[in-house]
Each structure stands twice: as structure tokens, then as C-alpha cells.
Amino acid sequence: MPKAKKRVSLASKASSRLPSSGKPSQQASIPNVELSSTVTSNSQVLNNDPLKETKKDKRKDRHFNWQQKFSNPKISASARKRRNRKARENLKVNVSSIGEVLPEIDLDISVANSRLKPVIKDSLSSKQTKSSMKRNTVEEIERFQAILKHPSFVSNPLETVREHLGNSLDSR
């Protein structure tokens, strides 16, 4: 299937709007012009006809409309100055309100610090080499076997663990 031919002018666009018979109708070919008015140039007819408005004309119109937004100020200069002055005054910080809040913040911080539990240093993960991990494992196994062989643990294990925890937590 061949490519569709690209339209290169607005005239071809206008021809596509013709009635299905292919012939322009009587109303489409004759513009609405009063008999008493005289046309001074062909450019006026082209500018009034939306089908023949060029891309350049459209761009000029769009640019003109865009410029009109800035040429008509919406507010007077005194109102603009008044608004700017109020905005500057609202930016000033009231330090007295901060001074009233500071004691409450200090109290909250001290309460939060007192609630923090001390971190047990042994529970922190530290980087260990393979050999130190192996040595610690062997020491832990020996310590656990010594506890299991202890006579107080053999007689009453729960009481011994409770006593050990009480002694170790009091020292910390």
C-alpha cells in the first residue's frame, strides 16, 4: 500500500471540505458581503475567511492574544504595593511564641531520654573473624557444660537461673 500523500497547503484542506459532489455550492463560493460596502484589498477577504487563514496569521493572532494578557494590569499599583507590604509583614517571626514552647520541648526530651533502656554492650553485633567466632563458640560450650554440672543447678535449675539473673541484673 503506497504512503498517503502529505498535504502541503491550506488550499487542499479547503478542497476537502467541499460537498460530496466535488463542486462548490453557491453559498460556499460567494462570501457574505453587503452590496454597499467596498472591498479595498484581497488580503481583507483572505483574513476574514477562516479556511484561507495562513499558519503565519494564526501564529500572529496567538502571539497578540498572549501579549494582551500582560498589557492589561488586573490591579492598581497601590494595591500591588499594599499586598507586597502585607506579605513582608507576615514573614516577620514572633520569637516570643518560640520562647514559650521551648520549656515544654526540653521536658519532652528529658522524659524521652529517661525512658530509653540502656543498651547491653554484649548484645551489640560486632565484626568477628572466623577464628574468633570459633573460639567464642568453644568457650560458650565449655561454660554451658560447667553450668549443667554445677551442684546447685542439678538440684534446682529454675531457682539457680532466677538467682543468677537477679545477681547479674543488679550489677548492671
Curated annotation (Swiss-Prot):
Residues 1-88 are annotated as: Disordered. Involved in ribosome biogenesis. Required for normal pre-rRNA processing in internal transcribed spacer 1 (ITS1). PANTHER family: PROTEIN FAM207A, RIBOSOME BIOGENESIS PROTEIN SLX9 HOMOLOG. InterPro entries: Slx9-like (IPR028160). It is found in: Nucleus, Nucleolus. The keyword Nucleus applies. Residues 12-47, 65-75 have a biased composition (Polar residues). One of its GO terms (biological process) is maturation of SSU-rRNA from tricistronic rRNA transcript (SSU-rRNA, 5.8S rRNA, LSU-rRNA). GO terms for molecular function: snoRNA binding. GO terms for cellular component: 90S preribosome; nucleolus; nucleus; preribosome, small subunit precursor. Belongs to the SLX9 family. Keywords: Nucleus, Ribosome biogenesis, rRNA processing. It holds the Pfam family SLX9. This is Ribosome biogenesis protein slx9. The keyword Metal-binding does not apply.
